Amino acid sequence: MSWNNRVVWSEGMFLRPQHFQQHDRYLETLVDGRCRSLLAGGWGFSELKLDDALLTQGKLAIVSARGVLPDGTPFNIPADDPAPAPLNVEESLRDGIVYLGLPLKRVGTRDTVEEGEALGGARYVSQVQEVRDDNAAFESRAPVALGSQAFRLLTERDGLGEYAAVGVARVREKRADQALSLDEDYLPPVLDIAAAPPLASFAKELLGLLHQRGEALAGRVVASSAGGASEIADFLLLQLVNRAEALTGHLSRVRPLHPQELYRELVALAGEFCTFTASQRRPEEYPVYNHDDLAASFAPVMLALRQALATVIDAKAIAIPIVEKAYGVHVAMLSDRSLIDNASFVLVVRADVPGESLRGHFPQQAKVGSVEHIRDLVNLQLPGIGLLPMPVAPRQIPYHAGSTYFELDRGSAHWKQLTHSGGFAFHIAGQFPGLNLAFWAIRG
């Protein structure tokens, strides 16, 4: 016979306490078996508050707690069950976890003891209380023996194998003044991230970081009219950030929110960000979700997201405005001088002449140099910085049919003059009707 089989009720049977006890076990097993498969990690705290005053005396005590034990037993302290006796932590306990425990049900073991008896392996303490008849028209009360759950605070030295236990806190040490030092990084198993303040705080922090990055990206996308690969990358990243911000905002307001649901979204987001921020464009191997060790599960993912959102993603292609001056001179001023050493420069030329003619004659009719030396290059007929025709438009900048693309020769002797210059100058000597110039810097 199974200890959890249902009772076969029949008319005229002589009822004994064993019938109801067996029926209770059957119902509890039925509910546990039906619910256990619905959610992995279906145990932990929904609420947890410790007594801070007793910590200074070397004791750990629970003020209030609500949740579910690993065996499926729900608890609500102190509303339904009394808080366990405070645990006087020994000085020898270092980096040890304190657990909230309840003895497991075992065949042949006494399940309930009377108030005042030694607990032994009992799960319940019987107390007689006056209970009102809810269906009576007048006040009608009767004494009823009620069993409250007999919780204990335990450490691993107490033999956790006989208990349904859930971690409460990790004690770093008991200091010389007898006060307990708790590990602030420890996260107990929870059913709602509200019971684990570091997780709830990170959800709000992430929402703020995503909003800031989204605003910066949106401003850059709106201000840009490039249409090249760089802007497409910004659009894709903005799409990712917008989706993540909306989802994170939703999750930060949902209660209860199981940590596994939060982890699933965070690890997916961290993997997506690697496409834009990781040098190999691939995510690292993140830890498998462990409900009994939330800190080890979340810490690497939280770090990866902070790093991804702190990374400055510069535009690969930067449009540099060209201003037409007198005597065929066009000037492009540089606001970021680091581009001289870290970027290649492309001049895009469009005119109402055949493309092959433009490709062959424009480099001969144009002189390129620094704004300070362009006059000398023209007057002394010096070559300046060479223009190298490009077979195709670089993928980082927009392609326009009919335009010809020239790369500035960084190997030119005049290139060093740009180090201390305000920008580039272009002198166009020939006649090119409908001439239109665009200038781009492409980061290496």
Swiss-Prot record:
Pfam families: T6SS_VasE. Disruption phenotype: Deletion mutant shows a severely reduced secretion of VgrG1a, VgrG1c as well as Hcp1. InterPro entries: T6SS_TssK. Core component of the H1 type VI (H1-T6SS) secretion system that plays a role in the release of toxins targeting both eukaryotic and prokaryotic species. Functions as a spatio-temporal marker for assembly of contractile apparatus made of TssB1 and TssC1. This role in assembly depends on TssM1. Forms transient higher-order structures that correlated with dynamics of sheath component TssB1. Interacts with TssA1. This is Type VI secretion system baseplate component TssK1.
